[in-house]
Design a protein with these regions (language model features):
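Hydrophobic beta-strand segments
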Residues: 48-52, 65, 79, 195
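Beta-strand-rich extracellular modules
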Residues: 37, 82-84, 232-236
Length: 258
């Protein structure tokens, strides 16, 4: 019997924002080998690109949607799945998940997505302890404590529900993340990363996780004009001698309208 592991805990608990909810999609651990399928029809998807950015590893699904992960890693790492005509998808996996057959369900695009960033981003100051969430997986240099990107949104988005979707995020060291066993930092914790839309704070991200959706208030949208999203990492709340930014990594940022 299929055992579907819906990755919803971080999506349900990890965001403090009005009307935040969970994105459908998940991973199953049944069958022989790994497979990429259409999330709605379960039809196999060929030619999907599956990558582990930190391991510099990439492969594609065959005509039956099957693929192998011939990469060695330990601890959490982000796996990305890309296919033309489908929404960006990423998943945090470890060696235990990778050791079992996976079925990855990805969703067809509705043509209204705006891809903000598909590459891996490292925010912070490159100063983190071994107990920090996923610190053993940090391989990129930090670009600084925040990331900002501008983009355009059409006037018809005002009649839709619009979301900033974060494909995957790791490294958050909040008190909530610690209570959920996502890090082993004993004597300190950080404030949550903050999300700003057109200069207004709209959310805090409390937990590490995948496919987190943050509602964009329609009254803040600049229709047919330039809009701006900023993600700012948190700060160590027990360090008062200097500013110690929490180091986090994230991937696959997009605007999705429904």
């Amino acid at each position: 019997m299929k055992k579907i592991l819906i990755l919803s805990l971080a999506m349900l608990l990890g965001i403090t924002a009005a009307n935040a909810d969970a994105l459908t999609g998940g991973v199953s651990t049944v069958g022989l080998g790994n497979k990429v399928v259409d999330a709605n029809t379960n039809a196999p998807i060929s030619g999907a690109q599956i990558s582990l950015p930190k391991q510099n590893y990439s492969t594609k699904s065959d005509e039956n949607g099957n693929f192998n992960l011939n990469a060695n890693f330990s601890g959490n790492t982000i796996m990305s799945v890309k296919k033309d005509g489908y929404k960006p998808f990423s998943l945090t996996i470890d060696e235990h998940i990778a050791a079992r057959p996976m079925i990855l369900g990805i969703q067809k695009s509705n043509g209204r997505e705006v891809v903000i960033e598909s590459a891996m981003l490292h925010l912070g100051d490159n100063n983190f302890s071994a107990g920090s969430a996923n610190s053993d997986q940090f391989k990129l240099k930090a670009i600084g404590p925040f990331y900002t990107k501008t983009f355009k949104m059409s006037a018809n988005t005002l009649n839709l529900n619009n979301y900033l979707v974060i494909g995957s995020i790791i490294g958050i060291d909040t008190a909530m993340a610690r209570s959920m066993g996502q890090n082993s930092v004993r004597n300190s914790f950080s404030s949550p990363p903050e999300v700003y839309f057109n200069g207004t704070k709209i959310a805090e991200i409390q937990l590490n996780g995948d496919n987190q959706k943050i509602k964009l208030p329609n009254n803040l949208i600049r229709a047919d004009n330039t809009n701006e999203v900023t993600i700012q990492t948190g700060k160590n709340l027990t360090q008062h001698a200097y500013v110690d930014y929490d180091d986090i990594e994230l991937m696959n940022l997009s605007i999705q309208s429904e």
